[in-house]
Curated annotation (Swiss-Prot):
Its EC number is 3.2.1.8. It is an enzyme of class 3 (hydrolase). Residues 29-352 form the GH10 domain. Transmembrane segments: none annotated. Belongs to the glycosyl hydrolase 10 (cellulase F) family. It is found in: Secreted. It catalyses: Endohydrolysis of (1->4)-beta-D-xylosidic linkages in xylans. Keywords: Carbohydrate metabolism, Glycosidase, Hydrolase, Polysaccharide degradation, Secreted, Signal, Xylan degradation. It comes from the Bacteria. The active site is at 155 (proton donor), 262 (nucleophile). This is Beta-1,4-xylanase. Pfam families: Glyco_hydro_10 (PF00331).
Length: 352
């Protein structure tokens, strides 16, 4: 009897060992789920890319993303460097890649205080507005039917609690009129494109209310605006997912779409932190993963209001955070590591 029990126990242990080994091997070969498929019933999944890196990221882009944003190639200094001179080549490469692979394209951006040549601001207010109208006609017209959404105006709001619009030539010379006209002219050129106001730190209550006020004024005047873009450049300390939810709820009161347009989560607690990690610390990757998890729980909760989430990059081997705010500092803000493998943050947002 004892021998029989012992034999059964040994057999069970063998079976258990075999099963665990099988499961381990199965897990090794487990298919990595496609982000765009996981979220196909919620919102588009996008990435900011360059014409120089789309083929470097080709496999990741085709599998996981269904929307692309040109990181710099549609900004004024690149696409319209001189009066009456347009260079659509770099942006066209991205748009063509997207079209061939069934992806949408977000246009970024028509009015911004950075990366705009100085000649744009020469002359009178009327001359500047006429120059902008011509720019919008050419750029939006060139991509009509290919770009489904535009960040028409980018970062117009001041970070100073006592100021509304930022101090920049567009607004110092033209005031809020330039914002209104930009949306009106973009809509005239492509009535089917969705038009967004886009800004950073919109999770902050003060800046949130500024954005609410701006968009409400535009809507009250009948200006065509369809959405607000929350950029979403986070650190491990700020903002909180709850702040994101508060902003989504507030903007939803305006009856507009909300998109997270430039999402990334730095592994630093402070934007100017002195550390420079050559290898990301595990505890920081854990914190990053938790923040992504909580953020996406909120984004899914507001399905129908949140219509798109775009990451500002594809994988950790290239991020704008290498250059700003601390030049040369390594960072690891995205869902895929430098070898293009999914990080813990990736698995946290696909498990639901």
């Amino acid at each position: 009897m004892i021998n029989q029990r012992f034999s059964i126990l040994v057999l069970l242990l063998i079976l258990l060992t075999f099963s665990l080994g099988f499961l381990k091997e199965e897990a090794k070969g487990m298919e990595i789920p496609s982000l765009k498929e996981v979220y196909k019933d919620y919102f588009t999944i996008g990435a900011a890319v360059s014409h120089l890196n789309i083929y470097h990221y080709e496999n990741l882009l085709k599998k996981h993303f269904n929307s692309l944003t040109p990181e710099n190639q549609m900004k004024w200094e690149v696409i319209h460097p001189k009066p009456y001179v347009y260079d659509f080549g770099p942006a066209d490469e991205i748009v063509d890649f997207a079209m061939k692979n069934g992806m949408k394209v977000r246009g970024h951006t028509l009015v911004w205080h950075n990366q705009t040549p100085g000649w744009v601001y020469a002359g009178t207010k009327d001359e500047i507005l006429a120059r902008l109208k011509e720019h919008i006609k050419e750029v939006v017209g060139h991509y009509k039917g290919k770009v489904y959404a535009w960040d028409v105006v980018n970062e117009a709001l001041s970070d100073n609690p006592n100021e509304f619009l930022r101090r920049a030539p567009w607004y110092d010379i033209c005031g809020e009129e330039v914002i209104e006209k930009a949306f009106i002219w973009a809509h005239e050129v492509d009535p089917d494109a969705k038009l967004f106001y886009n800004d950073y730190n919109l999770e902050d209550p003060i800046k949130r209310e500024k954005a609410y006020k701006l968009v409400k004024k535009l809507k009250d005047k009948g200006v065509p605006i369809h959405g607000i873009g929350i950029q979403g450049h986070w650190t491990l300390a700020w903002p909180t997912p709850k702040m994101l939810e508060d902003s989504i709820k507030r903007f939803a009161e305006l009856g507009v779409e909300v998109q997270v347009t430039e999402f990334d989560i730095s592994i630093y607690y402070d934007r100017n932190e002195n550390n420079n990690f050559k290898v990301p610390p595990e505890d920081r990757l854990e914190r990053q993963a938790q923040l992504y998890k909580e953020a996406f729980e909120i984004l899914r909760k507001y399905k129908g209001i949140v219509t798109g989430v775009t990451f500002w990059g594809v994988a950790d081997d290239y991020t704008w955070l290498y250059f700003w705010p601390v030049r040369g500092r390594e960072d690891y803000p995205l869902l895929f590591d430098k070898n293009h493998n999914p990080k813990k943050a990736f698995w946290e947002i696909v498990k639901f």
